[in-house]
From Swiss-Prot:
HAMAP family in UniProt: UPF0319
Listed Pfam families: DUF2057
Annotated signal peptide: 1-20
Protein's name according to its UniProt entry: UPF0319 protein YccT
Organism from which the protein derives: Salmonella agona (strain SL483)
UniProt entry keywords in alphabetical sequence: Signal
Length: 220
């Protein structure tokens, strides 16, 4: 699909969805998986927030922050992948609150026993379950969707079984075939399904920036 047509398709053909919870993103949090689905980093890059429906949610992410070393040197600290589950049934906004991470000692403590909080719009703590996502794959590139699915099937602390099977059939990301003028090849269908899903979750400003970028791309 040509980029211009894709932008028009996203802007005009997506169904209107009513969301009730805003997840405020942090530049120190690298979001990897949301509710069992791999995050589209290209679409959400620079986004300040994404919109969620009320109900249970699960995030897989890493904390990334520059820390100080002896001798006034610095390095980028990247935490192990973390899983956090929570419920937004009566919550309109979710904000990350990270602990102090300024040096190697604090980073080591966080690696061993990660702790952080999610706050609502009134800065009140949201009940959460937090865990480390143990990676079972030996591949150089980790498929966090698969690792999250395995985690959710293992009855761990932050597991949400309802998200364990959602990636088995990506057709659930596409509400109806009638939304498309024609049915594209399967590989293209999967790509569009994922793009539509993350476009719908992005905040209005991010959608606007993405459409501007898409219009500037040369036809494929």
């Amino acid at each position: 699909m040509k980029t211009g047509a894709l932008a028009t398709f996203l802007a005009l053909c997506l169904p209107v969805t009513v969301f009730a919870t805003t997840l405020r993103l942090s530049n120190e949090v690298d979001l990897l998986v949301l509710d069992g689905k791999k995050v589209s980093s290209s679409l959400l890059r620079g986004a300040e927030s994404i919109e969620l429906e009320n109900g249970p949610h699960q995030l897989v992410f890493r904390v990334e922050k520059t820390i100080r070393l002896p001798g006034n040197e610095e390095r980028l600290y990247i935490s192990p992948p973390l899983v956090i589950s929570f419920d937004t049934q009566l919550i309109s906004q979710v904000n990350f609150q990270l602990p102090r991470l300024e040096n190697e000692r604090e980073a080591s403590y966080f690696n061993a026993a990660p702790r952080l909080a999610l706050l609502d719009g009134d800065a009140m703590p949201i009940p959460v379950k937090l865990d480390i996502l143990a990676i079972t794959s030996t591949a150089k590139v980790v498929d966090y969707e698969i690792e999250t699915e395995r985690y959710n099937k293992s009855a761990k602390r932050a597991s949400l079984p309802q998200f364990a099977t959602m990636m088995a059939d990506d057709s659930t990301l596409l509400s109806d075939v009638s939304e498309l003028d024609t049915v594209p090849p399967q590989s293209q269908t999967l790509t569009e399904q994922r793009l539509k899903y993350w476009f719908r979750l992005a905040d209005p400003q991010t959608r606007h920036h993405f459409l501007q970028w898409a219009e500037k791309q040369p036809p494929s």
